[in-house]
Design a protein with these regions (language model features):
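Catalytic-site signature of metal-activated, phosphate-bearing donor transferases
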Residues: 7-232
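C-terminal non-catalytic accessory extensions
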Residues: 220-261
């Protein structure tokens, strides 16, 4: 698991979050927060949210991965089905446009609600006062090598390489706000691990990942990648001016691209 809901409302549960947004809300946009490897190398059997506590600045909009979001939505809203980042929307002529709020509970820009293919918050601002989604895309160097071997579940053709690492390995700030849920997390994990079969499966999964890493290190491409990960410094956020420059050109390229259909 590399995504964890980080609710900043007292109570830190989904019902607490829902109590802070308008009752007619169809969807809540939850911005990603990219967490880096925190200089960890090995595959350790420690909670992800405890191991990796350094991340990109909250206001960052570049690279594009820093501006992506996931969506918490009402099942009875104007949607057809699940999507990776946002649900598939119904025909607005029949169902209307969804009422969406941002991570601070404020209405999103109409463009976002009316552009179902839009998956990023480029130029739309990032709001995370109530909720955000901690995204641990790289984790430790060894874990990343295993991820490279596995690939991405929903984008089989996307390369998991050094460029992928550089665009996500931000360790600029320390943010431990998700630790507010640690007591509940630890209690639930203890309950799960009290089941002998689940405990056995957990140990087997950790053991498999460690052995898989050792096996991959016998092959030059994976060994070379691991070495480069160790040499690569943490990624440095670009300045707001540089981000604006890159976003402007991305928008220009999108506008000039041939329309599908």
């Amino acid at each position: 698991v590399d995504e964890f809901l980080n609710i900043h409302v007292p109570g830190h549960q989904i019902p607490d979050l829902l109590g802070k947004v308008p009752t007619d809300t169809d969807a809540i946009i939850m911005p990603w927060r990219l967490y880096g490897n925190n200089e960890r190398v090995a595959i350790d059997d420690v909670s992800v949210t405890e191991q990796f506590i350094r991340c990109i600045p909250a206001e960052a909009q570049y690279p594009v991965a820093a501006s992506l979001f996931k969506t918490l939505f009402r099942a009875k809203g104007p949607f057809n089905q699940l999507g990776v980042h946002r649900p598939k929307q119904k025909d607005p002529d029949k169902a209307g446009w969804p009422k969406m709020v941002d991570g601070s509970g404020q209405p999103v820009h109409p463009f976002l609600a009316k552009t179902p293919q839009r998956l990023s918050l480029y130029d739309l601002g990032v709001a995370r006062d109530l909720v955000e989604l901690n995204h641990y895309a790289v984790r430790s160097a060894a874990a990343f090598v295993v991820k490279r071997d596995r690939g991405l579940p929903n984008r089989a053709t996307k390369k998991v390489d050094l460029a992928y690492w550089v665009e996500r390995n931000f360790n600029t700030e320390t943010d431990t706000s998700i630790s507010a849920t640690a007591p509940t997390r630890d209690r639930e994990l203890a309950t799960l691990k009290s089941d002998p079969r689940l405990a056995e499966l957990h140990e087997a999964a950790v053991d498999w990942r460690r052995k898989r890493f050792e096996l991959l290190m016998q092959h030059e491409p994976f060994r070379a990648l691991f070495g480069r990960l160790l040499m690569a410094p943490p990624s440095r956020p670009v300045t707001p001016q540089a981000a604006a420059f890159m976003i402007r050109h991305a928008n220009l390229a999108r506008q000039s691209a041939p329309q599908k259909g």
